From Swiss-Prot:
Belongs to the metallo-dependent hydrolases superfamily. DHOase family. Class I DHOase subfamily. The lineage of its organism: Bacteria, Bacillati, Bacillota, Bacilli, Lactobacillales. It catalyses: (S)-dihydroorotate + H2O = N-carbamoyl-L-aspartate + H(+). Pfam families: Amidohydro_1. Keywords: Hydrolase, Metal-binding, Pyrimidine biosynthesis, Zinc. InterPro entries: Amidohydro-rel, DHOase, DHOase/Allantoinase_Hydrolase, Dihydroorotase_CS, Metal-dep_hydrolase_composite, Metal_Hydrolase. This is Dihydroorotase. Gene3D superfamilies: Metal-dependent hydrolases (3.20.20.140).
């Protein structure tokens, strides 16, 4: 049976134009006008008039908490949330219990991701055993087992020698090192950005140099080893300046920014509210502007949500005691479209480049990030014209820890398909 998506506004090859998309056997068979004439029988038609038809979004940074912390999220609920947000490929971080730090555990996670995920869930292997920055993993074995890349996300690799050896091993395999950059000796128990707002709230601050100092170290190591070094969730002006300089010197570096760091600064934190506690923290107004500018000038390559669900108890009370993290899969596209595209700061084409094309391209995902005949039919349909309210009751994630609940936005997901199969469809109310 074939599926025809009719009359949509298709994003392809950097432009948006009206076209039909014909899908057969999980693949895109044809793109063009009046394709209903191509298949006469057993054709399912989907009317996408006045809707955006885009390549499925790609998120290289999610936390699915499974195994070990399934009261926060599972592979299934996390992937449902991703589909709700228009994502068809996501990459799951290894801060799990047990940590996927052996070939056997990586293979098991890859199998579970395929079984339980409704979207394509790629698995990071850890850089060190137990995420402890000490003993390196079996890089060769973990690549063979299916590891997408290597990361100790949740904690930076604290010793330069360990990171250097990791980079050498990853480079030899043409694999990426994906780094949560944070020097633990510079944290001093902080819970939000160090600055005036932290002082006003009487809360301990996190210095921006805890991030940028480790980026500086790692960029020198990346230059020495030639590894593809990817920086997670950059958040400071100094960090992007370092990445910009490194790119000028032809160091093989890419980086991502999270939606919340584009949308909010520390001055937007209304009080001692754990829903505004994330790591890295919301930074200053100048930092936020630097992130926006760095997307526009190409220093920042992509947007990744850092989807980090927690239980209600873990995000209630005092910021000093609450867990770090914010959800993002279900709000990212709509919030960014509304706040940046509708206001003329970004174009729609740019937003899709950062949320789909670039992450797929930079990480060598040949079957993601573009709609072309012969490729997998991984796509999302968005309604850009109808305003709606982000409601807690609509979340498919177990986590509701986001300050964006209640926002009026545009860009609602109508339908998400993976390999030509519907994995999310909006219910009309």
């Amino acid at each position: 049976m074939a599926t025809l998506i009719k009359n949509g506004n298709l994003y392809q090859a950097g432009r948006i134009y009206q076209a039909d998309v014909l899908i057969e056997d999980g693949k895109i068979k044809a793109i063009g006008k009046n394709l209903s004439d191509v298949v006469k029988e057993n054709l399912v038609e989907i009317d996408a008039t006045n809707k955006l038809v885009a390549p499925g979004l790609v998120d290289v940074h999610v936390h699915y908490r499974d195994p070990g912390f399934t009261y926060k999220e599972t592979i299934h609920t996390g992937s449902l949330a991703a589909a709700h947000g228009g994502y068809t490929t996501v990459c799951a971080m290894p801060n799990l219990d047990p940590v996927p730090d052996t070939p056997e555990l990586v293979e098991k996670m890859c199998s579970r991701n395929q079984e339980d995920g409704v979207v394509k869930v790629k698995q990071y292997g850890s850089i060190t055993h137990g995420l402890k920055s000490e003993e390196l993993v079996d890089f060769v074995g973990m690549k063979k087992a299916g590891a997408f890349a290597f990361s100790n996300d949740g904690s930076g690799v604290q010793t330069a020698g360990t990171m250097y050896q990791a980079m050498k091993s990853a480079a030899a395999l043409n694999m990426a090192i994906v780094a949560h950059v944070e020097d633990n000796s510079l944290l001093f128990g902080g819970v939000m950005n160090a600055g005036k707002r932290a002082d006003e709230l009487g809360l301990p601050g996190i210095l921006g140099i805890s991030e940028s100092s480790q980026i500086a170290r790692d960029l020198l190591l990346a230059k020495e080893t030639g590894v593809h070094y990817h920086v997670c969730h950059v958040s400071t002006k100094e960090s992007v300046e370092l990445v910009r300089l490194a790119k000028q010197h032809k160091i093989n570096v890419t980086c991502e920014v999270s939606p919340h760091h584009l949308l909010l600064a520390d001055v937007d934190i209304p009080g001692n509210d754990p829903y505004y506690k994330m790591n890295p923290p919301l930074r200053g107004v100048e930092d936020r502007q630097a992130l926006i500018d760095s997307l526009l000038d190409g220093t920042i390559d992509m947007i990744a949500t850092d989807h980090a669900p927690h239980s209600i108890d873990e995000k209630t009370g005092d910021m000093r005691e609450a867990s770090f993290g914010i959800t993002g899969s279900e709000t990212a596209f709509a919030m960014l479209y509304t706040k940046f595209v509708k206001t003329g700061i970004f174009t729609l084409e740019q937003l899709l480049q950062w949320m789909s094309i670039n992450p797929a391209e930079k990480f060598g995902m040949e079957d993601a990030g573009e709609l072309l005949p012969g490729k997998s039919a991984d796509l999302a349909i968005f309604d850009l014209n109808k305003e709606y309210v982000i409601k807690e009751e609509d979340y498919l994630s177990k986590g509701i820890n986001t300050p964006f609940t209640g926002e009026k936005v545009y860009g609602q997901t109508v339908l998400t398909m993976v390999d030509g199969q519907k994995v999310y469809q909006r219910e009309e109310k």
